Amino acid sequence: TLAVTDNTTVGGTLAVTGASTLTGNTTVGGTLGVTGTLTASSIRFNGSRTSVSHSNTNDVTANSLFGTITSTQDALQNHESRSFIVNNSEVEAWDVIILTNQSQVTNVISTVTNITSGAFDILLSNTSSSPSGSFKKKINFAVIKCPP
């Protein structure tokens, strides 16, 4: 059992087997590995962030665990979909990708359709029976690392 009640800094790897409770600020400069239960009031990741622009038909490269992809002006016909590949060296085939729309575009949704080691696909779909009109979309992504 590990209990941290004050501010603590670990410069390398912190490996815990068993229950862990962190009530102070804990900074790990390397890898935090927990086998068991980790209880924390909040967890903050101070990793890299990326923003890239694309034309909705070109693939993009965003090598970080989270970031924002900004499209150039585009439009989708009624019930039309278009996908593009996000090349990302952080992604493994078993990871989970979460998308949120930073800019709201009525009836145009973003979904992840394929995850492979080194890349994932984003599908833009117009769910309406009318054309979408011109739009510029900002999509936030986050990679949740999962064990194989």
Task: Locate predicted features.
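Extracellular receptor-binding modules and their adjoining Ser/Thr/Gly/Asp/Asn-rich linkers
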Residues: 15, 21, 33-95, 102-108, ...
